[in-house]
């Protein structure tokens, strides 16, 4: 039987769920390490020569961005398409083709509001509608609204105002600062004002999310590992009722194996409260252990990057 050391979880914001830290014992860790070393060798054999190799010994930092909303641009095409490998540029803001050119436009109209994350995702199941190839509409899923907004490109500026709700308090570390490796940011809280609010209806989809980084052109390590982790979710039937998707760069590409879980709380009351849990150094062979413990309210400390509560 696997014995686990338990201690109270320390976090900058109280979670809606009750979680405890766990530490995997040495005996189990040694067995995992053997599998990890073999897997890393396999990944490194697939990487382009200019990509830094996957090193399982890199220490995982316990640091995540502070944010209020996560805006996910849905990639067109079925789950067998590979936009995460082909269409997502190294920097998504440089994409000039639809629908990805909407990301730089949206970010520009938001005026650098640091409390809003923007990523592209490619869905791996069919719980919410996805755009078709060459679709004239843009599909944005917004967390914690838990709503899908289908808008026209001409609506982006007003959609930015809607997302920002006219004003937003800036957290201490913006997502862009976080991705660029800045550990510190201004402590000053300021407001960003938009001239107009337009209400977008959206369609509600109350499901948890599993997001796996697979941004190949940002770092081939993530691009190679992401589909392997997706396959492990599917083969092991882990959280099969959750939305499952590959996501563009969320930091941590040096150690790779990055997964975000969004876990709803109080969905029966339509409260849209949820916990955001970030993990790194997740491999196909340790994913089941991570998910089973998470389902039981336990967070494996060795893979935990951090998290926040959202509502």
Curated annotation (Swiss-Prot):
Cellular component (GO) terms are:
mitochondrial intermembrane space; mitochondrial matrix
Q: Which domain of life is it from?
A: Eukaryota
Signal sequence, start to end: none
Q: After gene disruption, what is the outcome? A: Increases frequency of mitochondrial genome loss.
One GO term (biological process): cell redox homeostasis
Question: Can you tell me which family this protein belongs to?
Answer: Belongs to the AIM32 family.
- What protein does this entry describe? Altered inheritance of mitochondria protein 32
Please name the source species: Saccharomyces cerevisiae (strain ATCC 204508 / S288c) (Baker's yeast)
Name of the gene? AIM32
């Amino acid at each position: 039987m696997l014995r686990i050391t338990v201690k109270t979880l320390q976090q900058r914001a109280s979670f809606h769920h009750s979680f405890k830290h766990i530490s995997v014992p040495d005996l189990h860790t040694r067995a995992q390490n053997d599998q990890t070393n073999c897997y890393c060798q396999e990944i490194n054999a697939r990487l382009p020569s200019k990509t830094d190799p996957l090193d399982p010994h890199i220490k995982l930092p316990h640091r995540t961005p502070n944010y209020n909303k996560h805006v996910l641009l849905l990639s067109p095409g079925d789950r067998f398409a590979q936009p995460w490998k082909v269409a997502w540029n190294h920097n998504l803001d440089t994409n000039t083709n639809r629908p990805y050119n909407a990301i730089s436009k949206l970010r520009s109209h938001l005026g650098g509001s640091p409390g809003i994350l923007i990523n592209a995702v490619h869905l791996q199941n069919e719980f919410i509608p996805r755009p078709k190839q060459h679709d004239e509409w843009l599909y944005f899923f917004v967390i914690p609204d838990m709503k899908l907004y289908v808008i026209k490109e001409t609506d982006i500026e007003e959609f930015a105002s809607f997302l920002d709700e006219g004003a937003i308090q800036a957290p201490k570390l913006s997502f862009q600062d976080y991705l660029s490796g800045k550990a510190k940011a201004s402590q000053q809280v300021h407001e960003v004002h938009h001239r107009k609010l337009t209400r977008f209806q959206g369609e509600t989809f109350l499901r948890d999310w599993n997001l796996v980084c697979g941004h190949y052109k940002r770092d081939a390590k993530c691009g190679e590992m992401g589909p392997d982790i997706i396959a492990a979710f599917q083969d092991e039937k882990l959280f099969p009722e959750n939305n499952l998707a590959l996501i563009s760069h969320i930091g941590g590409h040096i150690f790779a194996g990055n997964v975000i879980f969004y876990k709803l709380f109080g969905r029966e009351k339509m409260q849209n409260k949820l916990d955001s849990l970030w993990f790194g150094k997740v491999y196909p062979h340790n994913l089941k252990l991570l998910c089973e413990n998470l389902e039981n309210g336990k967070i494996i400390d060795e893979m935990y990057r951090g998290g926040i509560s959202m509502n």
